[in-house]
Amino acid sequence: LSDRAFAGSDTWATSYTIAQAIRKIGGVDLILFGKQASDGDTAQVGPGVATHLDTPQITYVRKLVAIDASTITAQRMLEEGNETIRASLPCVITVVKEINEPRLPSLKGKMNSKKAQITVWKASDIGADPQKCGLNGSPTKVIRIFTPAARSDGEILVGEPEETTAKLVDKLMPIIVGASN
């Protein structure tokens, strides 16, 4: 997918664009995404595509347990542990890095990749509404990108509990009182 119409896309417009391409392909049963992109780090595109396609989704997948003609069963990571979920196909899944150990391509694979024909679709090729792509279709707008000011090192209070508690209260009260005004 490459078109100036896609420029400035947020995750919602990106999800719409990818969903339109999947519709064009047709007959897709399983749509696989990484958990998140390294640029925005939002983990929203996979679930957004599922929303646009009105398909089930399983996020944070660490292991595929079973798949048949109509369902997929996957184990997903949660903060508290793992959860096994079954969903009907077609389905969107987002995977975490623990799902697989990537392997390096063979020399033959590298050579063959140089000959590969890459199909490029523009917005018109996938039937995308220009008002839903790129900056036009993005409900969020980047106003400013900046590097936050460096934070000072923390302070360690040393002494007896009563003494350090009093010091801590003295330091926090102006912040607390100032925040409530």
State where each predicted segment sits.
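N-terminal glycine-rich FAD/FM-binding segment characteristic of electron-transfer flavoproteins
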Residues: 1-181
